[in-house]
Curated annotation (Swiss-Prot):
Domain comment, as recorded: IleRS has two distinct active sites: one for aminoacylation and one for editing. The misactivated valine is translocated from the active site to the editing site, which sterically excludes the correctly activated isoleucine. The single editing site contains two valyl binding pockets, one specific for each substrate (Val-AMP or Val-tRNA(Ile)).
Domain of life the protein comes from: Bacteria
InterPro entries in alphabetical order: aa-tRNA-synth_I_CS, aa-tRNA-synth_Ia, Anticodon_Ile_BEm, Ile-tRNA-ligase, Ile-tRNA-ligase_type1, Ile-tRNA_ligase, M/V/L/I-tRNA-synth_anticd-bd, Rossmann-like_a/b/a_fold
One CC-aspect GO term: cytoplasm
Protein name in UniProt: Isoleucine--tRNA ligase
Family affiliation: Belongs to the class-I aminoacyl-tRNA synthetase family. IleS type 1 subfamily.
Localization annotation: Cytoplasm
Organism: Prochlorococcus marinus subsp. pastoris (strain CCMP1986 / NIES-2087 / MED4)
Bound cofactor: record note: Binds 1 zinc ion per subunit.
Length: 965
């Protein structure tokens, strides 16, 4: 390059004007902050988004949107999720499917309620009634939805943004009442007293999906001794040895049951202790003469914990201990040992479980079996109530544990206290611990339709397949679903309670009436109207007898009803949906709640396929958090940060490219270094497209038809490779393996095009006469590449694809890339027989280029055209491929010297003595020599110059003919 410019300077004349140089308005820089919104405007103006998919003539494809929560700014999790969905929808649109994507939002629940309350002054909060709160919550949610909606649109996401589904809309709330009603009438919903996860900080019951388990939770665990007052009859029969029998009976004041618990505050609620009938237990005495009952397998651990030696007196099966009596540790009452289940193990503790039926599900089940009192000793705020007797008023998450432990210690019942690290449920919204608390709640009886749900899971395709095992095990093991919440911001449970008595009014008439009211007026009428207006006409005369319930439904019941409120209701969608796509945490959330409601109502799953993705982490694999300062903001990725040198504006397409680049089935990293790498890939693809566009500026395929058989071998291979790449990309999209698309795209643009085909094409494009076949044939191929490249990248790089399409220099039938259908090629383009020879020739080209580069590094030459190459083959495959090229190749294009971009190439039997370098490898001997002749000042090839150019420049015969000299 330098030598050419120097030569032209010396002569004072340049042939630049005679070359066919690149010409296009498609800029090297994306300028995405300005250009991408312009493209959105073009789509909107020409109805190239949602309406395009809706008017297709193919089959319906429904990707049902799992509703994000209408609170807070968009984050990388939103980006990963929504871009994945959009890639699929755009691909299906190009395939001709009817695609109508309805975005949705989850609008009810505590986080919005708390945001509203936090925005008010204390006196405003005190004066705010439920209806006022709902009005403010509605306004808040709509503002959040609008902010998120604009963000999604900026990412290039297509959807029915004018008609999204919102769980606060009247038609949605009405449909949800319909789902609840059908489940109730099918016998799957009931009201009962049961321990539920209770959040004292939120003052409401929580579902399993509303819990999180921080890694660093420590509980105050205690070992407690309970004084045995009476041995069971079975144990007495076991005591054949008279001395031992007498010893135990005479030592009842020193005979204890050893229990272990991590919730000391539940001790006042103790109604029994439970054992596993299959575990062996021992009565063992310590050095002080005290005798303790605990599991045999835990002797060593208990000795170490309590720092005591124990002597085993009696070994008994757990089943023999039933009925043994002990004195309650804090109350003046006596309780018994009962038979528990497999939840009692010897992994930790003593193998004997303190049982408070009002504060644990296993405890509750045992209590039901033995008809024990189901006593709740805690109020909704987490304070111990009158049933805790002397501890009444203490808070279970504050002072109750310490004072109860102190009382046990004072009464010589405390054996040990220590901190214990374990998984403990927290309220996912307030980030504070929860408790188990027995209250009257509404439940969905999963047991009633569990087998149907498990069968439905089998009928669904789960991607990845591990998702099936995950949700299957969850449904197998899950208890009844607590669906009632003690909050105002939600859809009310449509039930009326008898004021005087325990009657409950809910039936077909009341459900249908409430459903129709909500359809017309919305759920606010439940708080606005009195019972007389809410009840069906049949019951209005007795409205004084009833009062409406104030519980609302679990938000997972809200979103879990979306199949009924959206997919069943909208004609353009279908139920079951083709695809649900969300994060892997939704196996216990939306996937499961949707499955349970759909199966309970219609005995079928709401989806045909479920696809899951992982979470977005920082570059070091850590969870993003403000405290760590590692949060990556998608808005900053697109528009840049305050310091654009540190946080440049990459645009939405780089964000979308990131989504396509990762294995989203697992957690995925994102950060500044990754973004730089992605930006480089984006730039390479863009520059490849620019080169293609810039070299077809004077070409129109409609005016010049070229027969495939006329094309040079290189061009035939390139079209074959285009077909192969398109097929590979299609398979990647079909299988939702977008990272394969990313890899294929990189390889195609860099390896196949930039480093090979387009590198070789420079001489054809720049130097040839404008209409010369060697140039036109290349332009034909490039036009096919650029059009189809735009289409196959458009699901991911939608803005770049449209930008490419708008800069195609000739007329196209389609005004947008998205009006073009997915590529279909003439059969004649696919010619895999070319691959073996071309592959060999490319391999040889790489080795020769290495040798030339070695000479350049040692400053023996400047450009490759300053060399010629001698090749002595020692590999028949490569020799045959060169012969094939020589025999069948086009003499103006398929000369191997042109593929190498050297001035001459020779296959020799003997090497020259005078050379720059010799490389010897398994392909043969490669010799690099200085090119003979003089350099043509137009094409830079070294040849025997016979023509004197303008102002004493030198021209080869080819160039002289082209410019008519």
């Amino acid at each position: 390059m330098k030598s050419k410019h120097n030569k032209e300077k010396k002569s004072g004349f340049s042939y630049k004007e005679t070359l066919n140089l690149l010409k296009t308005d498609f800029s090297m820089r994306a300028n995405s902050v300005i250009r991408e919104p312009e493209i959105h405007e073009f789509w909107s103006r020409n109805k190239i988004d949602l309406e395009l998919g809706s008017t297709n003539s193919g089959k319906n494809f429904t990707l049902h949107d799992g509703p994000p929560y209408a609170n807070g700014s968009l984050h990388m999790g939103h980006a990963l999720n929504k871009v994945l969905k959009d890639i699929i929808n755009k691909y299906k649109t190009l395939q001709g499917f009817k695609v109508h994507f309805i975005p949705g939002w989850d609008c009810h629940g505590l986080p919005i309620e708390l945001k509203v309350l936090q925005s008010l002054k204390s006196n405003e909060r005190r004066n705010l009634d439920s209806l006022g709160l709902r009005k403010k919550a509605t306004d808040y949610a709509k503002i959040q939805i609008n902010n998120q909606l604009e963000g999604f649109k900026r990412w290039g996401i297509w959807g029915d943004w004018d008609n999204p589904y919102l769980t606060l809309k009247k038609n949605y709330e009405s449909a949800q009442i319909g789902v609840f009603g059908k489940m109730f009438l099918n016998g799957y919903i009931y009201r009962g007293l049961k321990p539920v996860h209770w959040s004292p900080s939120s003052r409401t019951a929580l579902a399993e999906a509303e819990l999180e388990y921080p890694e660093e939770h420590f509980s105050k665990s205690i070992y407690v001794s309970l004084n045995i007052t009476k041995l069971s009859d079975a144990v007495l029969l076991k005591l054949e040895e008279k001395d031992l029998r007498n010893k135990l009976l005479s030592s009842l004041n020193k005979l204890f049951i050893a229990i272990w618990t991590t919730t000391p505050w539940t001790i006042p609620g103790n109604e029994a202790v439970a054992i596993n009938p299959r575990i062996n237990y021992v009565f063992a005495s310590d050095q002080n003469g005290n005798i303790y009952l605990f599991a045999r397998d835990l002797i060593s651990e208990i000795c170490e914990k309590l720092d005591r030696e124990f002597n085993v007196l009696l070994d008994v099966k757990g089943s023999l201990l039933e009925g043994l009596e002990y004195k309650h540790p804090t109350k003046n009452k006596f309780c018994n040992i009962v038979i528990g289940g497999d939840y009692i193990t010897t992994e930790s503790g003593t193998g004997i479980v303190h049982t408070a039926p009002g504060h644990g599900m296993d405890d509750f089940n045992v209590g039901q079996k033995y008809q024990l009192p189901i006593t709740c000793i805690v109020d909704e705020k987490g304070n111990l109530n009158k049933h805790a007797e002397k501890f009444c008023g203490l808070n279970v998450l504050k002072d109750a544990n310490d004072l109860i432990i102190e009382d046990l210690e004072k009464n010589n019942l405390l054996l040990l206290k220590e901190n214990y690290k374990h998984r403990y449920p927290y309220d996912w919204r307030t980030k504070k611990p929860t408790i188990f608390r027995a209250t009257e709640q509404w439940f969905a009886s999963v047991e009633g339709f569990r087998s149907s749900a498990l069968k439905a899971i089998e009928d669904v395709e789960w991607m990845p397949k591990t998702g099936k095992k995950r949700i299957y095990s969850m449904v197998v093991g899950r208890g009844d679903w607590c669906i009632s919440r003690q909050r105002s911001w939600g859809v009310p449970i449509p039930v009326f309670y008898e004021k005087e008595g325990k009657g409950v009014l809910i039936n077909t008439e009341t459900i249908n009436h409430i459903k129709s009211l909500f359809e017309e007026y919305g759920a606010d009428v439940w708080w606005e109207w009195d019972e007389k207006k809410l009840l069906p006409e049949k019951y209005r005369n007795e409205s004084d007898r009833w009062e409406k319930g104030l519980d609302t439904m679990d938000v997972w019941f809200d979103s879990g009803s979306s199949w009924a409120a959206v997919c069943e209701q909208r004609e353009e969608l279908q139920y079951p949906a083709d695809l649900y796509l969300e994060g892997s945490d939704q196996h216990r959330g939306w996937f499961q709640s949707s499955l349970l409601t759909s199966v309970a109502v219609n005995n079928k799953p709401p989806y045909k396929t479920v696809l899951t993705h992982g979470f977005a982490l920082d570059e070091n694999g850590r969870k993003m958090s403000k405290s760590l300062g590692n949060v990556v903001d998608p808005n900053i990725i697109i528009n840049g940060g305050p310091n654009q040198k540190i946080q440049p504006a990459y645009g939405a397409d780089v964000l979308r490219l990131w989504v396509s680049s990762v294995d989203y089935s697992v957690d995925v990293p994102i950060g500044s270094n990754i973004l730089k790498q992605l930006s480089d890939v984006y730039r390479k693809v863009r520059n490849t497209a620019r080169y293609l566009l810039g070299n077809i500026h004077d070409y129109d395929p409609a005016l010049e038809e070229i027969d495939i058989d006329q094309l040079p071998l290189l061009d035939q291979w390139m079209l074959n490779r285009l077909v192969e790449v398109s097929d590979e990309v299609t398979i990647a999209y079909e299988n939702y393996e977008f990272s394969k698309f990313f890899q294929i795209l990189q390889s195609f643009c860099v390896v196949d095009l930039s480093n090979f085909y387009l590198d070789i094409a420079k001489d054809r494009l720049y130097v040839s006469a404008k209409t010369q076949f060697r140039r036109r044939s290349c332009q034909f191929v490039m036009s096919r590449i650029v059009e189809n490249l735009a289409v196959i990248i458009s699901p991911v790089l939608c803005h770049m694809a449209e930008d490419i399409w708008q800069n195609i220099p000739y007329s196209t039938i389609e005004k947008s890339v998205f009006e073009r259908r997915w590529p279909k090629f003439p059969e004649s383009w696919l010619n895999p027989e070319l691959n073996e020879h071309i592959s060999n020739l490319r391999t040889l080209r790489v080795e020769i280029n290495k040798a030339i580069e070695g000479c350049r590094t040692q400053q023996m030459i400047g450009a490759a055209l300053e060399t010629e190459v001698n090749y002595l083959p020692e590999n028949e495959f490569f020799k045959n491929s060169l012969s094939w090229l020589d025999k069948f190749g086009n003499k103006e294009v398929d000369l191997y010297r042109d593929w190498l971009i050297v001035s001459d190439f020779n296959i020799v039997n003997n090497l020259s003595k005078d050379c720059l370098s010799i490389d010897n490898n398994e392909l043969g001997k490669i010799q690099i020599l200085k090119a003979k002749g003089l350099k043509c000042d137009r094409c830079w090839h070294y040849q025997n110059i016979t023509v004197k150019g303008i102002e004493n420049t030198k021209l080869c015969e080819r160039c002289a003919n082209i410019i008519n000299l």
